[in-house]
Each structure stands twice: as C-alpha cells, then as structure tokens.
Amino acid sequence: MQDIGEAVIKIIAMPSDTNPAGNIFGGWILSQIDLAGSVAAKEFAPERVVTISMKEVVFKQPVFIGDLVVCHAKIIKVGTTSITVIVNVTAERYCKESHARICQHVTSAEVTYVAVDSLGNKIVIDPDLIRYRGF
C-alpha cells in the first residue's frame, strides 16, 4: 500500500507512442511523469493543482514497444502554495535469452505543482493538512 502523497502509474508502451526511430517518444514519457506527479499531489491536497515546472529530465535508457513503463511519484516538499514531487521512471521488459524480466531506470524528474482556485489564482494549501500529513 502506498502512502498519501505517493502514486504509481503503470502503462504498456504502444506502437502509437513511438518516434520516427521506433523508440517510445520522449514527450509521451514526460506526459506520464506529469500524470503520476499530479496524482500524488492531488491525493495529498484536495485543491486543483497545475504544473509550473519540471526540472532537467535526462533519458538514460530507451523505452521500446511492449515495455511496461512504471512511474513512481513521491512528494518531497510542500510549501505554502506548492507541492514538489520526484518521479522515477523504469521500463520493464522480458529478455528472451535469459528468460528473465529486466528492469531499467529510464529517467527521473522533479516536478512542482501549485494549488489554484477555479480562476487559476494561487491559493494556500491548508496548513493543518500539511502538518497532519507530516510536511
């Protein structure tokens, strides 16, 4: 079971997600990172959150069609109006030669979200909620 402020998204990379070289498109992976991070932030605070930044993302390994892409998101910091999440991305694939599953770290990202009202204005995250949830 995950803690509040954590999220795991698993998805199979499909042919429609490829770039011209046949690997999975980096933009698709960035989208999955943002989805996982926003789920973690939303589980922590009920306010609407929007992405304001994503720090450097370096792709260390390619992702291939059929890989199981796992995005594990965990809140690392909560401010007055913002929530910062670290998202680690791995790709799991079956190796025919060794008959084993291989898990490779693809990338990590630090994503910051800001709580906003219905008009898109920054709002304060409930301080009692922050204290109650241990930040």
Enumerate the predicted regions with their spans.
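Generic hydrophobic-segment detector
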Residues: I12, S16-D17, E56, V63, ...
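Hot-dog-fold acyl-thioester-processing enzymes
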Residues: M1-V50, V114-F135
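Small beta-barrel nucleic-acid-binding modules, principally OB-folds
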Residues: P46-P62
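HotDog/MaoC-like acyl-thioester-processing domains
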Residues: D3, A7-I9, F64-I65, I76-F135
